[in-house]
Amino acid sequence: MDIGKVIKERRALLKISQQDLADYSGVGISTVKDLERGVGNPSIETLKKILDVVGLEMNLQVKQTIK
């Protein structure tokens, strides 16, 4: 899954600009642009701020292994 693509599609659906997303989430515009392009390495906290604005959440699961 490409989280940047998911965020970009959700942002477009909500009709908010990259600048609006940056402003509402309290992160820099370059962070939003980099994330949507699939570059950069945002922290979990930064991702959470952005996801909150677009109405998404992130869940972590323990990976099942085959023995």
Q: Which residues does each predicted region cover?
A:
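Absolute protein N-terminus
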Residues: 1-3
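Short basic helix-loop element that most often maps to the first helix and adjoining turn
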Residues: 5-20
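DNA major-groove recognition helix of helix-turn-helix/homeodomain DNA-binding modules
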Residues: 45-60
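Short acidic DE-rich linear segments
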Residues: 65-67
